């Protein structure tokens, strides 16, 4: 709320109504936490949070940022998915960094098996750094970059 906050969404009164409360406060949709010193940290977005079957919240952005630090991963999207028993699990779609993977094999042509191994190791590395309910249970390797917005952000709904 204040003079520097937007007045609303252009030609979208419904989105404007959803974003502002009755007192005029703008709700960004960001989720945050505070540490013991009172510092705020943005964890993720309300619209993208994954609620596991046991009720735990998983913030995809946290896992995506960890995956992107791995050499084998160029782009990724983390979402919720159902396993064979209908439970919600953490699922990742990963576009591999073929150049980085190739560099580990002397810049020769790399096989699908080598790509799969490198991505699998990246997922294992991330999983070793998080609590079990946040672990990526299933992943898929995609062969094309993800569609992007005009600001070069990956479109989540693909």
Please state what every model-predicted region is.
Residues 77-80, 123-158:
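Conserved C-terminal "lid"/linker of ANL adenylate-forming enzymes
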Residues 15-16:
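Short secondary-structure edge/capping micro-motifs at helix/strand boundaries
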Residues 2, 7-8, 31-130:
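AMP-binding/adenylate-forming catalytic core of the ANL superfamily
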Residues 1-2, 142:
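A secondary-structure boundary/capping signal
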Residues 24:
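A structured beta-alpha segment of the ubiquitous adenosine-cofactor-binding alpha/beta core
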């Amino acid at each position: 709320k204040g003079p520097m906050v937007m007045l609303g969404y252009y030609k979208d009164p419904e989105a404007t109504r959803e974003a502002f409360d009755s007192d005029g406060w703008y709700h960004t949709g960001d989720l945050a936490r505070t540490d013991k010193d009172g510092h705020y940290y943005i964890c993720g977005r309300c619209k993208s949070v994954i609620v596991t079957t046991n009720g735990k919240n998983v913030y995809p952005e946290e896992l995506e940022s960890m995956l992107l630090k791995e050499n084998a991963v160029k782009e990724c999207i983390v979402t919720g998915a159902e396993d064979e028993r209908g439970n919600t699990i953490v699922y990742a779609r990963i576009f591999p960094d073929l150049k980085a993977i190739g560099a580990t094999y002397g810049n020769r042509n790399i096989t699908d098996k080598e790509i799969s191994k490198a991505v699998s190791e990246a997922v294992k590395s991330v999983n070793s750094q998080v609590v079990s309910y946040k672990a990526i249970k299933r992943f898929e390797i995609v062969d094309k970059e993800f569609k992007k917005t005009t600001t070069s952000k990956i479109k989540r709904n693909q």
